UniProtKB/Swiss-Prot annotation:
Taxonomic superkingdom: Bacteria
Similarity comment: family membership: Belongs to the OMP decarboxylase family. Type 1 subfamily.
Cysteine-cysteine disulfides: none
Keyword list, A-Z: Decarboxylase, Lyase, Pyrimidine biosynthesis
Function (record text): Catalyzes the decarboxylation of orotidine 5'-monophosphate (OMP) to uridine 5'-monophosphate (UMP).
Active-site residues, record numbering mapped to chain: 63
Gene, per the UniProt record: pyrF
Molecular function as annotated in GO: orotidine-5'-phosphate decarboxylase activity
Organism, as annotated: Hahella chejuensis (strain KCTC 2396)
Protein's UniProt name: Orotidine 5'-phosphate decarboxylase
Classification via PROSITE patterns: OMPDECASE (PS00156)
Subunit structure: Homodimer.
Enzyme Commission identifier(s): 4.1.1.23
Length: 233
């Protein structure tokens, strides 16, 4: 399941000039790009096409979560944009995820279909507060089982959950890990974080990295250092 660059740079920009200047500094041979809600809402589908025209594969990180037909049609639209990866919330349930898988089977281009388990910003206390009487790790495990049995290609998870998920779901199940920070970087707002080398060792397939690259004085150098660390494992 793993192929191509394993580092995915999160583009958290709202200013087009800053975005263009930043992307121009990156090498599509070293990374893929993640387009999230802020960027997509600000610039629309055209930004995906423009990034792809620069040679980058795009992870469309919109975390779709709705009734089955609505979510499936959104995933179909993402496939029509030619994205490399798209995600939905596993908590949307089996019928929703199966509807998304079924609609992609009819498309000439099918992106990787990934389920979000629990957001990496949530602590165990917050997970209990919103109504799940278990730890983050337990909830991730339950949702990952549901996702795989519903036809998902993999899940988004913290690298702290990756070893257990890798053992439980096999080598072909894709594990996409945000919350990646080089050792010297601050944790920012993601509670469950690990370094790139540790994440790969623990079984992660792809690493989502944001601020350590986007806020670096030399983004390409920061990217190269992370890629080097990943390839050293």
């Amino acid at each position: 399941m793993v192929g191509g660059p394993r580092v995915v740079v999160a583009l958290d920009f709202s200013d087009r000039k800053q975005l263009d200047e930043f992307v121009a500094k990156l090498d599509p041979g070293l990374c893929r790009l993640k387009v999230g809600k802020e960027l997509f809402t600000t610039f629309g589908p055209a930004i995906v096409e423009q990034l792809q025209a620069r040679g980058f594969e795009v992870f469309l990180d919109l975390k779709f979560h709705d009734i089955p037909n609505t979510t499936a049609q959104a995933v179909k639209a993402a496939a029509g944009l030619g994205v490399w990866m798209v995600n939905v919330h596993a908590s949307g349930g089996r019928r929703m995820m199966e509807a998304c898988r079924e609609v992609l089977e009819q498309e000439s281009h099918a992106p990787l279909l990934i389920a979000v388990t629990m957001l990496t910003s949530l602590s165990d206390e917050e997970i209990v507060e919103i109504g799940f009487p278990c730890s983050a790790q337990e909830m991730v495990g339950r949702l990952a089982v549901l996702a795989q049995s519903s036809g998902m290609d993999g899940v988004v998870c913290s690298a702290q959950e990756a070893p257990l998920l890798r053992r439980a779901h096999g080598e072909e199940f894709c594990l996409v890990t945000p919350g990646i920070r080089p050792a010297a970087a601050a944790a920012d707002d993601q509670t469950r974080i690990v370094t790139p080398a540790q994440a790969i060792t623990d079984g992660s397939s792809y690493l989502v990295v944001g601020r350590p690259i986007t806020r670096a004085l030399n983004p390409l150098d920061a990217l190269q250092q992370i890629v080097k660390e990943v390839e050293s494992v």
